[in-house]
Amino acid sequence: MENIQLINIGFGNIVSANRVIAIVSPESAPIKRIITDARERGQLIDATYGRRTRAVIITDSSHVVLSAIQPETVAHRFVVNKETATINSN
């Protein structure tokens, strides 16, 4: 059975670390296009609570999650969570 790892993406919102493909900044035109396409498909999850989008999380199910915390912060939580899971499994 696979361990489910959860990552806090701000304001009490959590995503499954196992499903995350990329954590990117929302400024570039291609990422803005991905956000627009996800909104049209009904696969956009806005977890910003009305704040400015600072990180875009893309999942293996083609869902796009918007977060109000920096991509570096999300990535750091991802790495720390992964290291903790590795230590706990040994």
UniProtKB/Swiss-Prot annotation:
**Pfam families, per the entry:** RemA-like (PF04025)
Classification via PANTHER family: REGULATORY PROTEIN SSL2874-RELATED, REGULATORY PROTEIN TM_1690-RELATED
Source domain of life is Bacteria
Report the protein name in the record: Putative regulatory protein cce_4590
Q: Which InterPro entries match?
A: RemA-like (IPR007169)
Q: Which residues form a coiled coil?
A: none
What's this protein's family per the entry? Answer: Belongs to the RemA family.
Q: Which HAMAP family match?
A: RemA (MF_01503)
